[in-house]
Regions:
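Catalytic histidine-centered segment of alpha/beta-hydrolase-like enzymes
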Residues: 238-251
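Gly/Ala-rich beta-loop-alpha elbow adjacent to hydrolase catalytic centers
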Residues: 89, 93, 97
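Conserved alpha/beta-hydrolase catalytic His-Asp/Glu region
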Residues: 122-124, 141-196
């Protein structure tokens, strides 16, 4: 058993398992727009709340690192008798996937990296500085009120105002605490595997939105340039959470990638 909360969806006898890892919020619920598409396609799907978030409460140490989060995934894979998975990670979740592909490559059949990065960049650092300053000065409610500004395009957020308001209320009700949030942000800010990208053999889908206001799409291009086996999916719009705002298009791309990397090799 794992101390972390996880959910298993889809057929238990599926030939392949997809594990979904969320971004800074850490909640399995981020992937709701993908669940039906993946299970309908025949995949077994694991989603989880990351340590110190949601239904996986824990006090995180100051030195908490992405490598610790990768070990948590191994714990979940072991608890679910999953020898290998297709790993999909959004932002921070993508960093977890990269770390896992380096530390335990036999557990990773493929990577889908959504608006992720391989090393720090000054624009995202400025965004996190502003968010942490807001958290420290004003508390969690203004912090979560500002979150949609970084996640969604303005037009989409305006058109989905009630949904966004409900998400903000939910995020505030389940806020993991300032100490945990600072530890998680420190972990993602310290992450740098740029010099080791070529060591990762797993095929990777690099998905990004060019209008992401939190993580420049060029960070995904950097991943594509450094990894060995890459499929690119750059969308013109959708924001940092384009797997939510452009779910149908994203799901098509993800399923197409998974069908190719899951297919058995054809004899020559």
């Amino acid at each position: 058993m794992s101390a972390l909360h996880y959910e298993v969806h889809g057929p238990s006898n599926a030939a392949a398992t997809v594990l979904l890892s969320s971004g800074l919020g850490g909640s399995a619920g981020f992937w709701l727009p993908q669940l039906d598409a993946l299970t309908d396609a025949g995949y077994r799907v694991i989603a989880y709340d990351q340590r110190g978030t949601g239904r996986s409460p824990a006090a995180l140490p100051e030195a908490y690192a992405i490598a610790d989060m990768a070990r948590d995934v191994i714990e979940i894979l072991d608890a679910t008798n999953t020898s290998q998975c297709h790993f999909a990670g959004h932002a921070l979740g993508g960093l977890v996937g990269l770390q896992l592909a380096l530390d335990a490559p036999s557990r990773i059949a493929s990577l889908a990296l959504v608006n992720a990065w391989s090393k720090p960049n000054p624009h995202s650092a400025r965004c996190f500085d502003a968010r942490l300053a807001l958290l420290g000065a004003c508390g969690p409610r203004p912090y979560v009120e500002a979150q949609p500004i970084f996640l969604y395009p303005a037009a989409w957020a305006a058109e989905n105002a009630q949904r966004v308001a409900d998400e903000v209320d939910h995020a505030f009700a389940h806020f993991p605490g300032e100490a945990n949030m600072r530890a998680r942000i420190a972990a993602l800010r310290a992450f740098d595997v740029d010099a080791r990208l070529a060591d990762i053999a797993a095929p990777a889908l690099i998905a990004a939105a060019r209008d992401d206001t939190l993580v420049p799409w060029t960070c995904s291009q950097r991943l594509a340039d450094g990894l060995r086996d890459v499929t690119l999916d750059f969308m013109p719009h959708g924001g940092h959470a384009h797997s939510v705002t452009e779910a149908e298009a994203f799901n098509r791309s993800l399923l197409d990638f998974l069908s190719r990397v899951s297919a058995p090799a054809v004899p020559a």
